[in-house]
Amino acid sequence: MGNQRECGVLLPISSLPSKYGIGCFSKSAYEFVDQLKAAGQGCWQILPLGPTSYGDSPYQSFSTFAGNPYFISLEDLIEEGVLTKKECDAVDFGSREDDVDYEKIYKGRYKLLRKAYERSEISKNPDFVRFQQEQAHWLGDYALFMAVKDRFGGIPWTEWAEDIRLRWNNALDYYRKELYFEIEFQEYMQFKFYEQWAKLKAYANKRGIRIIGDIPIYVAMDSADTWANPGLFKLDENNEPTQVAGCPPDGFSATGQLWGNPLYRWDVHRNTGFEWWIKRLAHCFNMYDVVRIDHFRGFDEYYAIPYGDKDAKRGWWEKGPGMDLFRTVSYRLGHKDIIAEDLGFMTDSVKRLVEESGYPNMKVIEFAFDERDTGNASDYLPHNYNNNCVVYTGTHDNETLLGWFADITPEERHMVREYLWNFHDDEKGICRNMIRLVMGSVAGRCIIPIQDYLLLDNKARINQPSTLGKNWKWRLKEGQFSNELQKEMLILATRFGRRNWTLDPEEEK
């Protein structure tokens, strides 16, 4: 990361303001980039962009390579002439501008996207043909996977008919012919997703704003990745998992966390020169400027739980690939800007891996005052940082700063006030002080969720782990990111040496 000081904002694409029910690559996204630039910000951190499954979590995606069709701008398709404004306005996408109604989005968006595809004559587009060729290593399998999944009523691929579940050649040939137009529809949506995303990213980069992407260490069991590459995962001869991922019991959970993702066969990956991982990361760095890798400790040791267990109590630790993977990444791809998400209890060997990789790790100020901590709360206090880290007030999994301060114990609130040496401000004043604290820290990069700048409570929380129903829904309302707030953020960014000084393209002229 070097000695350059940066700051940025965390906001998922889905949380952008939008006319049609969910944040996407529409004009609102470009306006948000302009607002970030006016606020002196140099980074925009987002969440994974893959197509989401039934829980709507971007960390449980149908593909690690594909993009979420929800993010395709309908406004752009109207301008292309493949949809009309009247058609889009007639669809019920939900009534709340600060909330995503995923059921209505699912029903409405795909109908419109199918109309756009049918009118597009996409097979005659040379750019589409080029896209198919360039993305051949994943696109065909993904499109077939989604087409077959739709044919079988959306059930997981592990419940499909045996011939296609086990990818017998005659079954693959049959479904490729039988579902030709459905497959092309899936490929069309990916083409539009990547076409629109490339334009938005270029717009941001031109204004000095780098995109920080996010990838989970694991893929979902019900994904094109596991279906198309079963040999890379711990599956049996019927392609059922033998072990799944999670976290052991700790001070926060007596039964641990059962994530259910299939585990990697690291010996197979090593024997292939980590080819799948090289393709995955190369793909990510075509999409993003910086990549945050979730659960980085899993590359040192990962927690394996017998498949079928109801909790994580009977799991055990196994060794991951360690530096072998990242030496290969460096050799094949060159130096890349990676953030190692190393939150939680860290062993000495995990710390050594992060240090040897050279990647900046993460600091979350909310973790610095936790009485339940298992031993490394002081690591999150700013006086213990070095330059090679990224500091956050909170992540997508955390309470908002205001919600957090309201919910912690009186003893913890006293610890915060004592550290800030502030015994008189109200809760919002304390949150402003916390933002100043991390912005003024020695950390090379500082990322703050937009909700914390807005001083919003936990109604604006993005995700509460291990819960269902209310997650991934919050949206920024039109006008909330005000000119006044942008000016305040600009002053902070300038004062603490983090300002994005890139000239606007118009100013350069």
Regions found by a protein language model. Give the residues of each.
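Alpha-amylase-like alpha-glycosidases and glucanotransferases acting on alpha-linked glucans and related
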Residues: 1-5, 12, 18, 56-194, ...
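Catalytic domains of carbohydrate-active enzymes, especially glycoside hydrolases
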Residues: 2, 27-52, 287-288
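N-terminal catalytic cores of NTP/NDP-binding nucleotidyl/phosphoryl-transfer enzymes
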Residues: 8, 12-33
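Surface-exposed amphipathic alpha-helices with a cationic face
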Residues: 37, 197-205, 330, 354-355
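Outer-envelope exported proteins of Gram-negative bacteria
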Residues: 47, 210-212, 216, 290, ...
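Conserved, well-ordered alpha-helix/loop/beta-strand core segments that scaffold catalytic motifs
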Residues: 186, 190-219
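Structured C-terminal cap/extension of enzyme domains
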Residues: 455-507
